[in-house]
Design a protein with these regions (language model features):
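Hydrophobic alpha-helical transmembrane segments
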Residues: 25-29, 40-45, 74-79, 101-106, ...
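Structural signal for the C-terminal ends of transmembrane alpha-helices
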Residues: 33-37, 87-94, 154-159
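Alpha-helical transmembrane segments and their lipid-water interface positions
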Residues: 42-46, 53-57, 84, 88, ...
């Protein structure tokens, strides 16, 4: 699971207005496939790998920089991964398309809530936090949520094999 997160952090897909990684997709995927406890533990292991200096995060240098990188502008988003993984595994997604889509928007919001709070603390609340930390990613996030909504029930069925 943490290897999948690492790979998803390193692959950048051209998208408007900024390139997208598949990290948030994989975090939600892990929650749906593994359930809340295992997914949260998997994301926790991924974060620990980054904290000790392994180059697992998006844009982290080959040699990694551990705590220095972790406490940078993306720390809040990374912490939000834990909550997103937990709630993606906890909520019931065996419903209709619109409800699944709404629940996935809810679970991904933890990434942005924590990310924006940390960004505001780090760079100052007088800066355009939403324009820097949320708006550029909105279309890509909605695209990923749409894909996950379409395949959520199939992903959940993976739990029987894990």
């Amino acid at each position: 699971g943490s290897l999948l997160l690492t790979i998803s952090a390193k692959i950048k897909i051209p998208f408007y207005p900024v390139p997208m990684t598949m990290q948030t997709f994989v975090v939600i995927f892990l929650g749906l496939a593994f359930g809340s406890k295992l997914a949260t533990a998997t994301v926790g292991i991924y974060l620990i790998e980054g904290l000790i200096g392994l180059p697992v995060f998006s844009n982290s240098p080959e040699k990694g920089v551990g705590l220095v990188y972790f406490t940078g502008p993306t720390m809040g988003y990374l912490i939000g991964f834990l909550f997103t993984a937990y709630f993606a595994g906890y909520l019931n997604f065996k419903t209709n398309f619109l409800i699944i889509f709404s629940k996935l928007v809810f679970v991904v919001s933890f990434i942005y809530i924590f990310g924006l709070i940390w960004l505001g603390i780090l760079i100052g609340w007088d800066k355009p936090i939403l324009q820097l930390g949320a708006y550029p990613f909105l279309y890509a996030e909605l695209f990923k949520i749409l894909i996950l909504t379409l395949i959520a029930k199939k992903i959940i069925n993976l739990k029987n094999f894990i």
